[in-house]
Amino acid sequence: MKEGFFVKAIQTAKYISIVILFMIDTSGSMSDDMITAAYSEVKGAIDQFGGKLEGWLGFFDAAIIEPKRFTSLDEFKIIKPAGGGGTDFQIILEYVHKHMQDKLPTSIIILTDGYAPFPEEELAGGIPVLWLLNNEEVNPPWGKIARIVV
């Protein structure tokens, strides 16, 4: 398996572990269609890795909805979106360093419209971050950027 920027594989003879924190923006500026598209992107990542994708799925607006761990598509499917306030990206990175120190994700994928101030890159603590944006207007100052069409 080729190792990419976001998907570091931890591999033994019979096991590959890919650990990603997916955070979906559920702020008031995100429509139901946008949230559904973001959720579908996460499901697509799980499907792409044939069940070998382990991770957490969380939601955020101005607060973190605690990420839920999943190790299978069935576990992923029972996680439901919550939120609806403003948007704060910094709380994601603070959450990771406060609550996930025992098992840091190999990467963080933030699915958002990007309409909020961006935190300083140093807060990521060296963890690769992908901003998965649903528009062409916003350009984060750091991390990798990908776009989805809604």
PLM regions: where:
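Alpha-helical subdomain
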Residues: P119-E122, P128-L130
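Acidic, polar low-complexity linker/tail segments
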Residues: M1-L21, M30-D33
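Conserved beta-strand elements of the Class I
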Residues: L21-F22, I109
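Generic recognition of flexible, low-complexity loop/linker segments
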Residues: V7-Q11, K43-I46, V96-K98, P117-P119
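…and closely analogous acidic/polar surface helices at protein-protein or active-site interfaces
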Residues: I18, G28-F59, L123-G126
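Von Willebrand factor
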Residues: G55, I64-R69, L73-I110, Y115-P117, ...
